[in-house]
Amino acid sequence: MTDQKAVATRLAPLGFAQAPAHAHLNLPPAALVEQALRRGEGVLTDTGALMADTGAFTGRSPKDRFIVRDATTNDAVWWGDINIPFDADKFGKLHQKMVAYLAEKEIFVRDAYAGAHPATQLKLRVVTELAWHNLFCYNMFLRPETGADTSWLPDFSIICAPGFEADPAVDGTRQKNFAVIDFTRKLILIGGTGYAGEMKKGIFGVLNFLLPHQHDTLSMHCSANVGAAGDTAIFFGLSGTGKTTLSTDPNRGRIGDDEHGWLPGEGGIFNFEGGCYAKVIDLSAAKEPEIWNAIRFGSIVENTRFVPGTHTVDYANKSVTENTRTAYPIYFIPNAIEPSVAGVPKNIFFLTADAFGVLPPISRLDKSHAMYHFMSGYTAKVAGTEMGITEPQTTFSACFGQVFLPLHPTKYAEMLGHQLEANPDVTVWLINTGWTGGAYGTGHRMKLAYTRTMITAALSGVLSEVQFKTHPIFGVAVPGAVPGVPSEILDPRTTWADKAAYDQTASELAERFIKNFEKYADFASADILAGAPRVAAVPA
């Protein structure tokens, strides 16, 4: 039986005059699953996971994400299409309407943390309309120790009510769904959408503002692992670059898979989260056993469907969305490190799937190149062939997570540069998991085994003993040899039958980098700009 006084105490700072008649506080996973089943929010799979649908929205809605523009944010936030301003008074009225809506509902309240390092940890309070959303928060945020006093005043709170829809004409939203962050009130309002990832990414956005702005701590959209010797590695990469696959290593402990912070000086890195939110489209036990085995009682699978006549999930089924996901606590992974903190990274990997076949499969970056490529956040995607479009499409996402950055990308890039200066033993690598021997359509995808071998070589330190040469256009340092990898694939130009075509394609890709960077030119330092490619013909 929930202590209504304890609930009322927790809800008062969030604007609730009194607790709703049916309010649940910090229910354990089994009780939340029970509530979700009772309320018809989901069904159990044959492995015991809770399968739930997110409704009309099967992903984030970036055009409906807002930040309140006030004295706290006006001069700090990078305003534009990503960080859309919202009126403070309208936020206050929207907040009141949501509280009134939830006052008549059965609600679920949870206390949690964000950030595994005590120096920057946020105390969270989450109010959800749905039981399975509360289970999502249990899985994804950091969990207080059993018996801990969590009657705190939260550092940030979330109110999430998918059943509450805004009136755009009155409330200042674009449409009925919304996610609005108010840094002064320390509150996120989410309504009209059942996509649970809005809560996770809402707090990520909060940390991406607070940590660099107030704690001199670099926030990063990356995965991280650590070796037996305590050597930490972090992996950046957009969708399709192999970030999850390459950062998952049975010989290395998992720190986290998506969101991390890097404390100043020798402070090291830490996970923001307490769980994993992994894509499961076409999931198989053979390809990703770690994720497969984590989908059990206590886990959530979103927007999936059963094999007809069974309770077995058909992971190939895309009838709802390709963005099918699972959410589970990090301790469901056998080699998870808890607490999720580690030392200063020894190696940093920027992953790109270059479908133009231009970038080396592995190259070392100096500080300027590291900052430039960090700000560029490049990969290339192959367009669908159903319309006859086969040309690769460049994708640039600043800091490998542009849509989550409240501050200007140069802020994060300069912080990375400062960290590299303060920690000169850190090595930054650019890894091309894309094409070799030609662009998409002519060449072929780099073998995963080779990429793994190259990363293992970088982690072991063996590459410090080989000769490097400078790429004539991108300026990165290319190793002449990697143990276990054919040396002829290390220089991308030598893998092309038509050398002139390589030179032309490399120059064209370099021009796309430069064109993308034009919007940052007035803000970027000379140090960052020094990492730009040089557009020039390579001698035959």
Segments predicted by a language model, with ranges:
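Short helix/loop capping segments that flank catalytic or ligand/cofactor-binding pockets
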Residues: 118-121, 167-169, 198-201, 244-245, ...
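Charged, amphipathic alpha-helical linker segments immediately N-terminal to NTP-binding catalytic cores
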Residues: 165-212
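A conserved segment at the C-terminal end of the G1
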Residues: 245-255
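ATP-binding Walker
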Residues: 241
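Generic C-terminus detector
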Residues: 489, 494-540
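Gly-rich Lys/Arg/Thr-decorated short loops/hinges at beta-loop-alpha junctions or inter-strand turns
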Residues: 73-79, 182-187, 393-399
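Glycine-rich, often acidic-flanked micro-motifs
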Residues: 3-45, 56, 221-238, 249-250, ...
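N-terminal accessory targeting/assembly segments
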Residues: 1-150
